[in-house]
């Protein structure tokens, strides 16, 4: 994401989405909008069995994910709490993970009064219901540190959460201190990313298996043992949307 022209900034300012303080105060009483950031990220996705066979350095395991859309709701910029709850429940159902096991959630957290409040309520309904009152769920948002990368914000959050579960430490959001990973093994984290058009995405990450195998010249493929309580659930048919300015162009 590169801010090379003024148009997007002008439109966001007119929408009232940008923070006049130039800071992103995610989940903070001072939340008054976000600050735009620049950056990008790339990850290599590989089947776990193939990565283990090849002796790759596995940073995390993607246990499950879900995507939905609430674009038919109250308006373009109005998030839907129930839709966010549904995408969270579906992601953890596909991952075979009880929401109460999650040790950290990387928020979408743009730092807007409405968006943060809705996201907090959805997380509380789904991930807070099964938690011990003495073990609150740590949350954070990379946007407080690097701003909102807009189209690249999701991959930034994914990379941050992957490093969290791999290193067993939660880095600080702006004005906070780092913290050790809460109890529980393996380390599990959730990552949320929401689009302005109503698309909601949540991914469940798990710490890599230990110890990490080293590749050898005579290494042989081997079966990966998946515990019965962690079945793989295929998400079903995936849409391939097409659009055009006219029906004839769409057919072509």
Language-model features, listed with the residues they occupy:
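Short glycine-/aliphatic-rich beta-strand segments at the starts of folded cytosolic domains
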Residues: 236-243
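N-terminal amphipathic, basic-rich helices that act as targeting or association modules
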Residues: 157, 241, 250-251
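Condensing-enzyme catalytic core of the thiolase-fold
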Residues: 1-232
């Amino acid at each position: 994401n590169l801010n090379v022209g003024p148009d997007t900034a002008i439109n966001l300012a007119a929408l009232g989405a940008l923070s006049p303080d130039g800071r992103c105060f995610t989940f903070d009483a001072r939340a008054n909008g976000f600050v735009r950031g620049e950056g990008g990220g790339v990850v290599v996705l590989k089947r776990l069995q193939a990565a283990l066979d090849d002796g790759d350095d596995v940073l995390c395991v993607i246990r499950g994910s879900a995507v939905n859309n609430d674009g038919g709701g109250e308006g373009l910029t109005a998030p839907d709490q129930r839709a966010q709850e549904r995408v969270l429940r579906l992601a953890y159902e596909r991952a075979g993970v009880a929401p109460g096991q999650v040790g950290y959630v990387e928020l979408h957290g743009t730092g807007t009064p409405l968006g943060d409040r809705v996201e907090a309520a959805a997380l509380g309904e789904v991930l807070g219901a099964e938690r011990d009152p003495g073990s609150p769920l740590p949350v954070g948002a990379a946007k407080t540190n690097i701003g909102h990368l807009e189209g690249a914000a999701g991959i930034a959050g994914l990379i941050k959460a992957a490093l969290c579960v791999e290193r067993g430490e939660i880095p600080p959001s702006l004005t906070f201190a780092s913290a050790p990973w809460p109890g529980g093994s393996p380390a599990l984290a959730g990552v949320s990313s929401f689009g302005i058009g109503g698309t909601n995405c949540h991914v469940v990450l798990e710490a890599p298996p230990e110890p990490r195998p080293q590749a050898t010249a005579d290494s042989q493929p081997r079966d990966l043992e998946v515990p019965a309580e962690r079945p793989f659930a295929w998400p079903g048919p995936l849409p391939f949307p097409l659009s055009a300015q006219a029906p004839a162009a769409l057919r072509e």
